[in-house]
Amino acid sequence: SGSSVSSAGDINSDGFDDLIIGASNASPDGIENAGSSYVVYGKTLFNKELNLSNLNGRNGFRLDGAMKYDQSGASISSAGDINGDGFDDLVIVSSDSVLLNGIYYSASINVVFGKSSGFSASFNLSDLDGKSGFRLIDLEGSDAVAKTAGDINGDGFDDLIVSNSFADPNDIENSGSSYVVFGRSSGFDATFDLSSLDGSNGF
């Protein structure tokens, strides 16, 4: 663990900021290199050591990659509050999702919505359904990063910025692209294709 680390914001809105720790080469439940990310809830007092295997849903939880070689947790960050529900959200990059939208070895971006309670000890990113979060697809290559962009259009919802250095815009090989996805209160599907950005939902 510790291949990537970040503040997670306050995903359960208890007044304490939380941590997220990536382990992109982990093999949860025997799924080779699916990757895992660990969320540790903030609180007033900690022991001098914390074993991540002891996260139980009350003190934090584990997020597992959707498939073999997913390498989820390669990049992790707070996503701000994308859906404006008062809970900070998480963004987790899967760097080598084997097949997404016809592109082999392409990255995908997983957004997990925060909430006050109800996280189990582990959650598989394949279970994101639009209500619990969603996955951004149509990224070329394995090199992608996503971060909160703040509220760039002033609608009260935090937005997400995604960089993809291996993208080929206008047939210019590996010249790279960045995408902004606007936050909103509802209407997220389980997957969102970045090629559908049209100016009203991002650009």
Which ranges hold each PLM region?
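Conserved beta-strand/short-helix segments
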Residues: 1-203
